[in-house]
Amino acid sequence: MEKEKNKKTSSLNVLSIAGLQPYQKKIDEEYMNKDQILHFYKILETWKTQLQDEINHTLLYIQDNATNFPDPIDRATQEEEFSLDLRNRDRSRKLIKKIEITLKKIKEKDFGYCNSCSVEIGIRRLEARPTADLCIDCKTLAEIREKQMTG
């Protein structure tokens, strides 16, 4: 499979693809002002477009390379490769839904605040994970609880 297709999408990669630098907060700047909202809107839209392109590329790749190999081992290898591609496609599709939810939060002026405690999530955390809906403290607590539940 092509190397380009196997690249992992990261928020830093999305920043560079969007042609953006990390946001430089100004002194006494209000949290989630117009500039910050625009910054994250561009990041999310670019990320969504990139994921949609990858999904389309996966479908085209599978359609173009679907061959009925006479050798069962070759056929099994191809099926496993396609299975991995489809699993990645499904993961991307779920991430697109999270991005769309986050874009909706931006439109509703509810972006950047923790769903649990309503505190500011923070610019750097949102740049690292633009779809974050919990502040670092609430996320840490949730992970500790999850770890305790699973043992």
Curated annotation (Swiss-Prot):
GO biological process, one term: regulation of gene expression
Superkingdom: Bacteria
Subunit structure: Interacts directly with the RNA polymerase.
Record-stated family: Belongs to the DksA family.
MF GO annotations: zinc ion binding
This protein's encoding gene: dksA
Job description of the protein: Transcription factor that acts by binding directly to the RNA polymerase (RNAP). Required for negative regulation of rRNA expression and positive regulation of several amino acid biosynthesis promoters. Also required for regulation of fis expression.
Protein known as: RNA polymerase-binding transcription factor DksA
Zinc finger annotations (dksA C4-type) as residue ranges: 114-138
Subcellular location: Cytoplasm
UniProt-annotated binding residues for Zn(2+): C114, C117, C135, C138
Database matches in PROSITE patterns: ZF_DKSA_1, ZF_DKSA_2
